Amino acid sequence: GSYWVVEHAYPSGLLGWLSIVLKRHCEVLHELTKDEWVEFGEISFNVMKALKKTLNPKKEYLSCFAETRGFEHIHFHVIPKTAAFDENLPGTHSFRYLQVSEKNAIDIAKIRELCTALKQEMSGKWR
């Protein structure tokens, strides 16, 4: 998009954990422009549909905190509740998936494969 970029979190213990990141620096939601919000809606819609087709999650979480030191920049987490999702990590507990070492993270080749599939699903859907 013009305002946002989608990337896979790494290291991550959950395949499909995506971030929708604002391209310009901003730390608070109330400073986003209407155009940025409109595009965010379009991108998040397309991301959810693409995740459904590729990973078939039963549900998705969408969150934005932007408060952890070094991560104050506006970004949204898209967390798919796939068959691999640990039901003992509901809600904000799911952030434990980001507390893994690279050694225990999802294999980068699997992430690249998923990102290629997601890109195919979403191609041509941006304004």
Roles of regions detected by a PLM:
Residues 1-127:
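HIT superfamily nucleotide-processing domains
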